[in-house]
Amino acid sequence: MAFFEGNNMTGGYGKGPNIINSCSLNVERGEIVSILGPNGAGKSTAMKAMLGLLNLKSGSVVIEDQDISKFSPQERVQRGISFVPQTKNVFSELTVRENLEIGGFLRKDDIDIVINQIYELFPILAEKRDQVVGQLSGGQRQQVALGRALMIQPSVLMLDEPTAGVSPIVMDELFEHIVKVKKTGVAIIMVEQNAKQALSISDRGYVLVTGENKFEGSGKELLNDPEVRRSFLGA
């Protein structure tokens, strides 16, 4: 059994149709797993199901052999699962440090220790700690979002389109930071449209089509799979 997994998840929003159908995903600690696929494939929905943001009609979500399918999103955060949404993931009117402090609101210990660890991972945040986040570049704001999510020292980090809207150079830099986070032992699941680049840093990947598992394998296997390349990588 993997460290964190969603098993045969089926569900949608409210009373609407199912968006994911018998979808299964898993990740180990110290691993990056990418969820890929065309628009409308259910990628973000699968992630949100694992976060408890929609009710599953069937299937389960398990972390460290504990079934958390009935846990609320807040309880899942307390269990060590952190999430960076694609948009509205920082407080633009607050400083870098204030954003990190908000990310650590669940902590009972001295958050300065954790903040300093975040500064070591993301040196630019230390440099700009007193700057208002709304004045930062897109890539720097994403680093703030990552840092804030890491303030609970999660065992699982879920990222929804972390490189959306940034330049190729900034995308490469963000992926380098994500790899650094992985090396601390965090299990990382990310939804990405930049499939080639995501697979190049991923230990494993899943390709979803209409909410179902279509392909899965190591990042290298998926990059080299002719059908995956033709259908999803534009090659």
Give the label of every model feature segment:
Residues 2-235:
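Glycine-rich phosphate-binding loops of nucleotide-dependent enzymes
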